[in-house]
């Protein structure tokens, strides 16, 4: 792996800092604390540049909250950084480092990265199952236990050192990585391990969580060869192959690799025959010839459709959330559900109009501020 250097100056460059502030402000320009920064953006860009150049940046405490995430409603602990200076620093770092971190990432390593969402994993699985039925007789499925909260700082920093030779960039990553257990205090979770964990919900984390498993992705794919398929969505891994013996060896390979970082596989890992049951992954159920949605998700979606359809005024949050969930149905073989519970019940046109009107209001507010 060729190490990358001489990049820190690009991060604290005034123009990059100014663009980072604007990136961080997207979707929240009407907030008072954001308005204050945008009204004097040139001054704040200079201040941001100076604190990065002079190494005076110190992360602020996070706001910790729990959410039910995505269509699967998985309970997650989010650590939200302050807009100023933390989110602006994160964007300044990511604007320069994103293309560098993207290099070497396995093609079907998806999740948390723009352009590499669940759709890429879904299409990859469907394509392989349909085109290569003989090579997809068996399936290996697993995920990592509490991945984000268990990421070891020492191994993550060592991996970054193998990728980056600029000591100042490594310093900034170190500040962000070390800040999480110290500043994301949550009474519900208890004291955090000071040597482990990165926060869900901040921009650098989405790259770091994928970057740490980059070697594992290539190691598995090399072991499986061309006659198998592999995809990883953040910490969930699915692999297919013509025989289960080799997939059991993949489990051993993954366990050994993760064990070096004191990470563990969840106990519900499995190797099974595709003809006996579908692949339950990303909220979908993948069969050899079709893709459906998990029943629990359809039940929640049914309730949501009924609730929103009865509203006199639909909020932006409800409109965007429901449009996203309806997209799941569109991307699956769920014709019966569409006909019975969506068609003539909820208007996508109405939902899109809510989103469009809100965006017009936001653009008008931005023009007035300018």
Where are these regions (language model features)?
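Short Gly/Ser/Thr- and Asp/Glu-enriched loop/turn motifs at secondary-structure junctions
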Residues: 60-62, 231-235, 268
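Conserved polymerase palm-domain catalytic core
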Residues: 51, 128-234, 238-255, 273
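Conserved pre-motif C helix in the palm subdomain of viral-like polymerases
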Residues: 74-106, 194-222
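Right-hand nucleic-acid polymerase module
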Residues: 87, 91, 186-195, 248-255, ...
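Non-catalytic, polymerase-adjacent accessory regions of viral genome-replication enzymes
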Residues: 1-46, 362, 366-370
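Active-site-proximal segment of RNA-dependent polymerases
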Residues: 3-8, 94-152
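Amphipathic alpha-helical blocks
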Residues: 37-61
């Amino acid at each position: 792996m060729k190490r990358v250097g001489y990049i820190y100056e690009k991060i604290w460059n005034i123009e990059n800092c100014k663009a980072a502030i604007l990136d961080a402000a997207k979707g929240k320009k009407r907030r008072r604390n954001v308005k204050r920064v945008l009204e004097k953006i040139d001054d704040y860009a200079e201040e941001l540049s100076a604190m990065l150049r002079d190494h005076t940046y110190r992360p602020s405490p996070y706001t910790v909250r729990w959410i039910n995430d995505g269509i699967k409603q998985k309970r997650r602990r989010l650590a939200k950084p302050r807009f100023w200076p933390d989110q602006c620093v994160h964007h300044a770092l990511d604007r320069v480092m994103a293309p560098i971190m993207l290099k070497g990432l396995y093609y079907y390593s998806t999740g948390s990265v723009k352009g590499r969402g669940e759709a890429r994993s879904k299409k990859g699985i469907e394509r392989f199952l349909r085109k290569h039925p003989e090579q997809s007789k068996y399936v290996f499925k697993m995920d990592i236990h509490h991945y984000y909260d268990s990421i070891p700082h020492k191994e993550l920093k060592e991996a970054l050192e193998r990728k980056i030779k600029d000591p100042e960039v490594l310093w900034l990553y170190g500040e962000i990585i070390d800040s999480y257990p110290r500043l994301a205090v949550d009474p519900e979770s208890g004291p955090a391990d000071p040597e482990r964990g990165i926060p869900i919900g901040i921009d650098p984390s989405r790259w770091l969580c994928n970057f740490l498993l980059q070697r594992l992705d290539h190691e598995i794919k090399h072991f499986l060869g061309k006659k198998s398929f592999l995809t990883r969505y953040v910490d969930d891994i699915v692999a297919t192959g013509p025989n289960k013996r080799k997939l059991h060896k993949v489990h051993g390979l993954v366990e050994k690799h993760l064990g070096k970082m004191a990470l563990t596989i969840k106990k519900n890992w499995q190797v099974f025959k595709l003809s006996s049951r579908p692949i339950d992954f990303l909220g979908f159920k993948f069969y050899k010839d079709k893709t459906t949605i998990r029943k629990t998700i359809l039940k929640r979606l049914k309730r949501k459709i009924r609730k929103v359809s009865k509203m006199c005024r639909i909020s932006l949050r409800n409109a965007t959330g429901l449009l996203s969930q309806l997209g799941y149905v569109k991307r699956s073989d769920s014709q019966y559900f569409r006909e019975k519970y969506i068609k003539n019940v909820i208007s996508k046109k109405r939902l899109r109009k809510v989103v469009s009107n809100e965006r017009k209001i936001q653009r008008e507010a931005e023009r007035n501020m300018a």
